[in-house]
Amino acid sequence: MKWWKLSGQILLLFCFAWTGEWIAKQAHLPVPGSIIGIFLLLISLKFNLVKKEWIQDGADFLLKELILFFIPSAVAVIRYKDTLSQYGIDLILIIMISTLCVTLVTGLLTELLLKRKGSVQ
């Protein structure tokens, strides 16, 4: 019974991802469909169209098995080691700088939203 419940929850999560992909494709948006799907899920959770309990176990399972989604990346690293040896330092710098930028923007935005929320209450 647990596997049926888990499968149903994962299927529901994938439905949001597929819907986001479809919207991105139909509207020719420059945003990845998975991001649109996550946004749709957020809206559905916010307005109680989808209850947290309906997806909790499936989301937890996917997070626990997250390492499996990185295996193709590891294989690509091995496959393109010549490219990495040529551009490795550049790639590492780009990854570090972009991670720093994302972290800074996320922190500043969170701080701004918390200040705004604090002033409203």
Swiss-Prot record:
The chain crosses the membrane at residues 3-23, 30-50, 58-78, 89-109. Pfam families: LrgA. Its main location: membrane. Belongs to the CidA/LrgA family. CidA subfamily. It is found in: Cell membrane. PANTHER family: HOLIN-LIKE PROTEIN CIDA (PTHR33931:SF2), HOLIN-LIKE PROTEIN CIDA-RELATED (PTHR33931). One of its GO terms (biological process) is cytolysis. HAMAP family: CidA (MF_01143). It comes from Bacillus cereus (strain AH187). Increases the activity of extracellular murein hydrolases possibly by mediating their export via hole formation. Inhibited by the antiholin-like proteins LrgAB. In an unstressed cell, the LrgAB products probably inhibit the function of the CidA protein. When a cell is stressed by the addition of antibiotics or by other factors in the environment, CidA possibly oligomerizes within the bacterial cell membrane, creating lesions that disrupt the proton motive force, which in turn results in loss of cell viability. One of its GO terms (cellular component) is plasma membrane. This is Holin-like protein CidA. Keywords: Cell membrane, Cytolysis, Membrane, Transmembrane, Transmembrane helix. It is a multi-pass membrane protein.
